[in-house]
UniProtKB/Swiss-Prot annotation:
Designated name of the protein: Acetate kinase
Record NCBIfam families: ackA (TIGR00016)
HAMAP family: Acetate_kinase (MF_00020)
Pathway(s) this gene product operates in, as recorded in its UniProt entry: Metabolic intermediate biosynthesis; acetyl-CoA biosynthesis; acetyl-CoA from acetate: step 1/2
GO cellular component: cytoplasm
Subcellular location: Cytoplasm
Length: 387
């Protein structure tokens, strides 16, 4: 690909601690010229010792797809950054001052922001002549109503240490809400929606028009729904209890809640396909994990129906939401009195693309809407650069 088609493209990078995902996409058409992932960064015996090597490997993979970044019409590099704190909530062109401030904010997201910053620094060094733009997971939820954003703790402490509900997966929630409106051929501003982003990380949001009214994740991505490895909502006293009675340190408890809890903590597996196999074999732990997962999901759906007052549409998205028909069914079964009537003939496993899975006479429309965070980030980049 030599860029002779005149398309402008954005290289979107999602840099994690042990993996780097990338996609080269045309923000106008939505067509991806190349997409891939570099894994096992920094692991023992890995051929990818650090993020510099990872990005160079990504460039090799792009070249293998016939992409020459020098002639591909590249106009920007978009970086997914999980946490922008109270400072950054709009797509932001990266410079030394912005990066320095992001380093200061890393305490708010110690698991996510540092590897993103590593990816940014390497990408700026290897692609110095291109604009680099950060798009923040927390941005969409910056203007949550105070009643939803505020934790009922000592106000002085909260203000001093920027403790509030920030929310995450914001790029996905915004994109899916827009796509749902387009699918229904209805104005976005007139819709009240619940979006359920269900992947290894899971989050829910209640959205009125273009404004989110509530979301399940909080100061960090640990709060809310049960997830693949995260506990979601939990009594905060569990932390002090384990510290005092089990002799665990705070960091150990936090690591357990983030990496050894949720579905994997209850069942030993986090992949829902494997979980389903265990359930079918009669594994009680797997069944309990599934029941806890769907119970929490149903609680949030019910809560957000109340927050919105009137709901027009519920959208399932991300890996589990898009592909697991049983989760979708069990999330809303028995809610006919609340206005949700699923059509089992439409709620099929293996179906692709945006689709309706509720009955035609269901007061609340239920959709499956594939997310595309890379495309949303690419479009944000072009927008902030004035394209």
């Amino acid at each position: 690909m030599d860029g002779s088609d005149g398309a402008r493209r954005v290289l979107v990078i999602n840099s994690g601690s042990s993996s780097l995902k990338f996609q080269l996409v045309d923000p106008e058409s939505g067509v991806a010229a190349s997409t891939g992932i570099v894994e096992r960064i920094g692991e023992e015996s890995s051929p990818v010792p650090d993020h510099d090597a990872a990005l160079r490997r990504a460039f090799d993979m792009l070249a293998g797809d016939g992409v020459d970044l020098n002639t591909a019409g590249l106009v920007a590099v978009g970086h997914r950054v999980v946490h922008g704190g109270n400072t950054f909530y709009r797509p932001t062109v990266l410079d030394d001052a912005v990066i320095a401030r992001l380093h200061e904010l890393s305490e708010l997201a110690p698991l996510h922001n540092p590897p993103a910053l590593l990816g940014i620094e390497v990408a700026r060094r290897l692609l110095p002549g291109i604009a680099h733009v950060a798009v923040f997971d927390t941005g969409f939820f910056h203007d949550l109503p105070p009643a939803a954003a505020t934790y009922a703790i000592d106000r002085e402490l909260a203000d001093r240490w920027q403790i509030r509900r920030y929310g995450f997966h914001g790029t996905s929630h915004r994109y899916v809400s827009e796509q749902a409106a387009a699918f229904l051929d209805r104005p976005l501003r007139g819709l009240k929606q619940i979006v359920l982003h269900l992947g290894n990380g899971c989050s829910a949001s209640a959205i009125a028009g273009t404004r989110p009214l509530d979301t399940s994740m909080g100061l960090t991505p640990l709060e809310g729904l049960v997830m693949g490895t995260r506990s979601g909502d939990i009594d905060p006293s569990v932390v002090s209890y384990l510290c005092h009675t089990a002799g665990m340190g705070v960091d150990d408890v936090e690591s357990m809640l983030n990496h050894r809890s949720g579905v994997v903590g209850l069942s030993g597996v986090r992949d829902f396909r494997r979980l389903r196999e265990l359930i079918e074999s009669g594994d009680g732990a797997a069944q309990l994990a599934y029941s806890v997962f769907t119970h929490r999901l149903r609680k949030y759906i019910g809560a957000y129906l109340a927050v919105l007052g009137h709901t027009d549409v519920i959208s399932f998205t991300a890996g589990i939401g898009e592909n697991d028909a049983a989760v979708r069914r069990d999330a809303v079964s028995g809610m006919e009195e609340l206005g949700i009537v699923l059509d089992e003939r439409r709620n099929l496993p293996g179906a692709k693309g945006a689709r309706q899975i509720s009955a035609d006479d269901s007061p609340i429309t239920v959709l499956v809407v594939p997310t595309n965070e890379e495309l949303a980030i690419a479009r944000d980049c072009v927008r902030v650069l004035g394209g």
